[in-house]
């Protein structure tokens, strides 16, 4: 398989540090070869690991055991850990463009993206709500057809609505949206995670899942019709269930992924249960994309205090997903 492509994110954040630390765990965690894309200087500013510049992803395979291969995108200004600037945002933007292009061209097996600062990116022409929507756009996929899934060793969740105010959730949470997100989720749990018959559950929006309409009708008017349609398509999906009881160990054993009406319903349990190794992966794309489920953490940058666990988990998930998708495609041909 081709190496993984890993963007460094904002070079003033913890991205360079966690990528360097992940490379240092390449043997103990059996991480497949990868190359970083971004400012090589930003890695050298926070780590003493050996770095080798490359101009061809194929070079990464032979270099990886001895040094971190880097597709260098130099900054126009000095990069200072913890102090983001426009030049750093330009590097992060360019790295993301390059990473998507290389994976689309088949020169890398999957894309792993370190955290960026959207506030900084907006200063240099970035117009998307986040990296998920950017990657979908560059892959020719409508934003509504790209599904964010958060995953850890103990739980997977999908937020049905993402970065919108709560007052807008009621309008966006339609049967059409739920059905679309569920279909994409089922397909990629099969392709990327080798789960032949995915089990889905849906959380209610209102307290106690609406109490049969006495605390809101979203469950009756939007969620239940979607579930009935999906069940008619032979998808294993149940709900709506009260969100406050859906994430206990006993409940989690009954499903493979929980679809959650709101952003925080999906992210709070992941960050509570799997804070140090949660991964954000985008479903519905022609490529594999994962990301550690945390931000740039500018106050930690340059202090050697950043935990690389989520980056390691994102690398492992990307490699496994690429392998599973390849096997799924081959089985489809053979079958």
Curated annotation (Swiss-Prot):
Belongs to the PdxA family. This is 4-hydroxythreonine-4-phosphate dehydrogenase. A divalent metal cation binds at residues 163, 208, 263. One of its GO terms (cellular component) is cytoplasm. It catalyses: 4-(phosphooxy)-L-threonine + NAD(+) = 3-amino-2-oxopropyl phosphate + CO2 + NADH. It is an enzyme of class 1 (oxidoreductase). Homodimer. Its main location: cytoplasm. One of its GO terms (molecular function) is NAD binding. Pathway: Cofactor biosynthesis; pyridoxine 5'-phosphate biosynthesis; pyridoxine 5'-phosphate from D-erythrose 4-phosphate: step 4/5. GO terms for biological process: pyridoxal phosphate biosynthetic process; pyridoxine biosynthetic process. Catalyzes the NAD(P)-dependent oxidation of 4-(phosphooxy)-L-threonine (HTP) into 2-amino-3-oxo-4-(phosphooxy)butyric acid which spontaneously decarboxylates to form 3-amino-2-oxopropyl phosphate (AHAP).
């Amino acid at each position: 398989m081709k190496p993984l492509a890993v963007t460094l994110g904002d070079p003033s954040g913890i991205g360079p540090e966690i990528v360097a630390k992940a490379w240092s765990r390449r043997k103990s965690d059996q991480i497949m070869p990868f190359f970083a894309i971004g400012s090589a200087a930003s890695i050298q500013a926070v780590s003493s690991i050996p770095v080798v510049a490359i101009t061809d992803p194929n070079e990464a395979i032979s270099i990886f055991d001895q040094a971190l291969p880097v597709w260098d995108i130099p900054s126009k200004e000095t990069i200072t850990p913890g102090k983001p600037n426009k030049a750093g945002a330009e590097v992060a933007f360019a790295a993301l463009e390059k990473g998507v292009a290389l994976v689309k061209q088949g020169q890398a097996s999957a894309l792993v993206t370190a955290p960026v600062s959207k506030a900084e990116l907006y200063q240099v022409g970035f117009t998307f709500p986040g990296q998920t929507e950017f990657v979908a756009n560059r892959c020719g996929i409508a934003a509504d057809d790209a599904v964010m899934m958060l995953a850890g060793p103990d739980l997977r969740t999908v937020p049905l609505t993402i970065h919108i105010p709560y007052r807008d959730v009621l309008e966006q949470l339609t049967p059409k949206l739920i059905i679309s997100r569920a279909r994409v989720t089922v397909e990629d749990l099969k392709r990327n995670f080798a789960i032949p018959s995915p089990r889905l559950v849906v959380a209610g929006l209102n307290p106690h899942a609406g109490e049969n309409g006495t605390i809101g009708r979203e469950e009756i008017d939007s969620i239940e019709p979607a579930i009935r349609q999906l069940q008619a398509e032979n998808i294993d999906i149940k709900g709506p269930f009260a969100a406050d009881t859906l994430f206990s160990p006993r409940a989690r054993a009954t499903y493979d992924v929980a679809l959650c009406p709101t952003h925080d319903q999906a992210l709070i349990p992941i960050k509570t249960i799997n804070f140090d190794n949660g991964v954000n992966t985008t479903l519905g794309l022609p490529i594999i994309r994962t990301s550690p489920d945390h931000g740039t953490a500018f106050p930690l940058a340059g202090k050697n205090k950043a935990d690389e666990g989520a980056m390691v988990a994102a690398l492992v998930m990307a490699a496994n997903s690429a392998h599973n998708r390849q096997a799924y495609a081959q089985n489809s041909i053979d079958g």
